[in-house]
Swiss-Prot record:
Cytoplasmic side: 192-264
Disulfide-bonded cysteines: C25-C101, C46-C82, C70-C96
Location within or outside the cell: Cell membrane
GO molecular function, one term: phosphatidylinositol 3-kinase inhibitor activity
Lineage top rank: taxon: Eukaryota
Name listed for the protein in its UniProt record: Phosphoinositide-3-kinase-interacting protein 1
Coiled coil (residue ranges): none
Keyword list, A-Z: Cell membrane, Disulfide bond, Kringle, Membrane, Signal, Transmembrane, Transmembrane helix
Domain Kringle positions: 24-101
Residue stretches spanning the membrane: 171-191
Gene behind the chain: Pik3ip1
Main location: membrane
Record flagged with keyword Membrane: yes
Amino acid sequence: MLLAWVHTFLLSNMLLAEAYGSGGCFWDNGHLYREDQPSPAPGLRCLNWLAAQGSRESLTEPSPGNHNYCRNPDQDPRGPWCYISSETGVPEKRPCEDVSCPETTSQAPPPSSAMELEEKSGAPGDKEAQVFPPANALPARSEAAEVQPVIGISQLVRMNSKEKKDLGTLGYVLGITMMVIILAIGAGIIVGYTYKRGKDLKEQHEKKACEREMQRITLPLSAFTNPTCETVDENTIIVHSNQTPADVQEGSTLLTGQAGTPGA
């Protein structure tokens, strides 16, 4: 799986390099240079790569192709260069000046080794020779390897998240069980709160009724007496002090006149 991602990454970088090449620029050591500059400096002219390498009889350096533009086949840290004709007529290596491409991009530069593997010699009559990347191209390859795991991990995480969506029967059962437990806990909390609230209200009502009963029992006596309205018992017997008159006996009556004198 990781190897497939590496191939995809390299292919995208190659396509990106071709896109920039078609626009007149190419990547080299993290920089963007102009592709069609045939002069290393004012007044100088680059020699054809095949002609210059053929005259030098050097097979260790890879050939950039059948053209005379500034390139960097040996990964020179100074940047692109080309061969020029010296005073003695021997091809001489000369770094190119002012070859920076005015276009900018935020994409990472493609590995130079992948570009070099795609380039082949275009000289007529010559056999096609396999071009091997130089030894100093390893840092660029290591930089690409450092970037690859990051992209691969993010893609793997997305794939794993998609695969984990299907929880299976056990997952659904556990999910439903957890939902039932949560709902039961919530219902228990609501019922408990309602029961406690009703019990508190009932106790308050009973307490108020008890207080009213105690107030009725412990009222002062003045609340039951009214001085303006006194009642008398109807069965009370009234005893008077009048004496019963005695019987009058004959001969005992006093002879008194109207004037009250005896014998009158």
